[in-house]
């Protein structure tokens, strides 16, 4: 089941970032995301039912999953899509939000009491370096300030959601957790 869920997650997740810059040319970023997450939540609900996951869970866990969804999908993807609508390129937005693992590791020690190993830091450094090398950026391009701010909000949303989920919603199955997250973002 985890393999199926992984493919489902990759499909839904990657399609948003890739298609976002094109979508906001024809639709409001937030209307597009609302439509997207209504569809995604329906798919995760169906997936959860097929695999007989327990959908009715403790209200507190539902609340925590929904906060994660608002932070992750609302602020993160909302910030990214809004930055596109303000004229920021997907390239620069990706460079900003790919700082998320670095920021998460910096905050996970004090908040989650986790120790980040030197090996993890090296991996994150090379991942960020690889992103810069693969994506690159044209320094001569004019950069819209509002778009940069929206991408920073997206970065903070993804970081907060990652920490929140690790702290509060790690006991929920992935498909049910994603159902409530997508539902709250829609």
Give the residues covered by each predicted segment.
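Cytoplasmic-side transmembrane-helix entry/capping segments in multi-pass membrane proteins
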Residues: 6-7, 60-68, 116-128, 147-148, ...
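Residues that define the loop-to-transmembrane-helix transition and helix capping
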Residues: 30-31, 91, 117, 175
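Juxtamembrane C-cap of transmembrane helices in multi-pass membrane transport proteins
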Residues: 15-27, 39, 77-88, 96, ...
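Hydrophobic transmembrane alpha-helices of multi-pass small-molecule transport proteins
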Residues: 44, 116-136, 155
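Alpha-helical transmembrane segments of compact multi-pass small-molecule transporters, enriched
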Residues: 16, 39-43, 96-110, 125, ...
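Specific transmembrane alpha-helical segments of multi-pass solute transporters/efflux pumps
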Residues: 16-17, 45-97, 105, 133
